[in-house]
Amino acid sequence: IDTGDKSVEEQEKILEFDKFADIARKDAGGILVDGKSSGIMYAYAKCCNPIPGDPVIGYITVGEGIKIHRKTCNNLINLTSIDPDKLVAVQWPGTDGTLFVAGLTVKGEDSPGILNDIAHTIVSYRSTNIKSININTNDSTFEGSVMVYVNNLEHLNILIDRLKKLRGLYKVERFEGT
């Protein structure tokens, strides 16, 4: 993992995201190329860090197999303009009803009951199951991550919108790599 000239805090966040992404991808199973499982070598692009549920597409590379990108990845858009013939259809395995692990970053004012409020807001929407919660406090603020099982990106986005309405939370966003 390349952490370059990043601070210890930034390095910890990179490691935390990589751990999350590994769990989410392992839970989802292998990528399907042209609709079927295969022994084709592939890797996830670090530029956009796709996770299960993201619309994805593959880009054939030399020596690294197929790189899996989010369809909205700026780097992929640039690569496609150079050589569009290297694109290949890929998708996450599973069918409707499949649950994906998704991660959220939360920040806010530390107050009694805030963790309960976060958990209740999550489980009260479609009985969403929580995989893990990790919250750290510093003086009167907290920061942490929440991993949840969601059906799709719409499910995740609705959870984010619901959490943003909680008093005391001033940041709720999808867990992204840095």
Give the ranges of each region predicted by the language model:
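N-terminal non-catalytic structural scaffold regions of very large proteins
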Residues: I1-L115, S124, K131-N136, N152-H155, ...
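Residue-level signal for beta-strand positions within conserved beta-sheet cores that form or flank
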Residues: K86, F142, G168
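Short secondary-structure transition/capping segments
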Residues: E143-G144, F175-T178
